[in-house]
């Protein structure tokens, strides 16, 4: 699928390959171009090298650079500050969701989640990207 017919470009970063595959499959089925990263450093590099990212999905706890730190960085860069971010985590600490929202995330999804829950949250995220 070419960028001309896609609904947008979404950066997805998670150190769990199964989660990456699931999120990518759902987003591609919805017509998005998906850029994946296996850790925070890869996500940071993708942000620097990719153009036209319309939304991002980050795991809270990733090697090298945690999700909230990536979001804080995005909020300091003019070209990234309006990109909506969804955070996900399997950790049960409620502080992580507070930290994610404080960093600037707009959607938070605890793992494990159902495909329907993920689709609902992704639609919310993409709705933010369009507004």
Tell me the role of every PLM-derived stretch:
Residues 20, 63-64, 81, 93, ...:
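The feature encodes the CheY-like receiver
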Residues 51-58:
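Active-site beta3 strand of CheY-like receiver
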Residues 31-38, 46:
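Short hydrophobic/Thr-rich beta-strand motif most characteristic of the beta2 strand and flanking loop
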Residues 21-29:
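Charged docking surfaces used in two-component/phosphorelay signaling
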């Amino acid at each position: 699928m070419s960028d001309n017919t896609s609904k947008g470009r979404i950066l997805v970063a998670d150190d769990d390959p199964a989660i990456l595959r699931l999120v990518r499959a759902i987003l591609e089925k919805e017509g998005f171009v998906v850029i994946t990263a296996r850790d925070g450093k890869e996500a940071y590099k993708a942000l620097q090298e990719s153009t036209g990212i319309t939304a991002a999905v980050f795991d809270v706890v990733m090697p090298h650079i945690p999700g909230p730190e990536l979001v804080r960085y995005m909020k300091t860069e003019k070209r990234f500050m309006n990109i909506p971010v969804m955070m996900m985590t399997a950790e049960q600490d409620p502080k992580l969701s507070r930290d994610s929202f404080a960093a600037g995330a707009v959607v938070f999804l605890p793992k494990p989640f159902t495909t329907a829950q993920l689709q609902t949250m992704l639609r919310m995220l993409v709705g933010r990207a369009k507004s």
